[in-house]
Amino acid sequence: MHSYTLLAPAKINLYLEIVGDRPDGFHELVMVMQTVALCDRITLRPNGLQEFRLFCHHPLVPQDSSNLAHRAATLMAKEFPRLFANYGGIDITIEKYIPVAAGLAGGSTNAAAVLVGIDLIWELGLTRPELETLAARLGSDTSFCVTGGTVICTGRGEILDPIAPLTGLWVILAKYDHLSVSTPWAYQSYRQKFQDTYLSSPEDFHHRRQQVSSGALVQAIAQKKPAAIGKFIHNDLEKVVLPEFPLVAELRQVLGDLGGLGTMMSGSGPTVFTLCSSQEVAETIVKEAREILVAPDLQFWIAPITDTGIQVT
């Protein structure tokens, strides 16, 4: 049996709107998601055992069944028990380059890579939609991470509508190491403060999805107008996260003042990103930001936008 190493890219939210409450307790969302070429490396090796083992050098990444990548492997074993019995377990090694607990879907993209890798090792021949359906059972971002690119994501985030790929741009990612934001807290706080603005009917949800799909940001992406893209990025969760996390608010303000195309918090944070027209512009902004924000645990990453999801190396 073959071993495989896969690249699992991070994601940013170019658009995140909370539309209303769903019967299942989740929020109805309309998002535009984008993969970024800052990637973890996931290696899967058959181990000849009847178990999955997970290894990672990062101290904040659990190496047990609480890890979403391990849960992805367990899901595959439950879905395909005969193949699991025949092929046996797999050792999963995660080389972590995406910041942890950062709003960049690091856990989700690792899980997506495990699904793709086990499909290859067990020679299942699953289609991309079949992999996305399995991924949706693991988390709201995981389906998107399988395919990547530039995608309108609705429902909990698992309903995917790919659009014209956004290419040629670079992104700065910035995060304080000591900061983390609880995603459940962010959404619950938004509900408490803004529930009176929620839409309630499926018809209203559909209408709002259509409005965003034909709206200014999606048009700017289709027309490849970088300045307009930066102007129309949006994240509802900033309304609750930024007031409670002044360092994130300050980071957003500083980066936004330094001349990129657009700056915003990704997902529930605390990572802030800036879209840039080139690597050189991104490097200049990071240099200037470091001079303004002198903090030993403030980390920056620069990477191009990518139109791919999980890739085999």
UniProtKB/Swiss-Prot annotation:
Gene3D superfamilies: 3.30.230.10, GHMP kinase, C-terminal domain
Residues at which ATP binds: 99-109
One Pfam entry name: GHMP_kinases_N
Active site: 11, 141
Segment forming the signal sequence: none
BP GO annotations: isopentenyl diphosphate biosynthetic process, methylerythritol 4-phosphate pathway; terpenoid biosynthetic process
EC supergroup of this enzyme: transferase
SUPFAM superfamilies assigned to the protein according to its UniProt record, in alphabetical order: GHMP Kinase, C-terminal domain (SSF55060), Ribosomal protein S5 domain 2-like (SSF54211)
Record keyword Transferase present: yes
Record flagged with keyword Transferase: yes
Function: Catalyzes the phosphorylation of the position 2 hydroxy group of 4-diphosphocytidyl-2C-methyl-D-erythritol.
Family: Belongs to the GHMP kinase family. IspE subfamily.
Name this protein carries in UniProt: 4-diphosphocytidyl-2-C-methyl-D-erythritol kinase
Species whose genome carries this gene: Microcystis aeruginosa (strain NIES-843 / IAM M-2473)
Designated gene of the protein: ispE
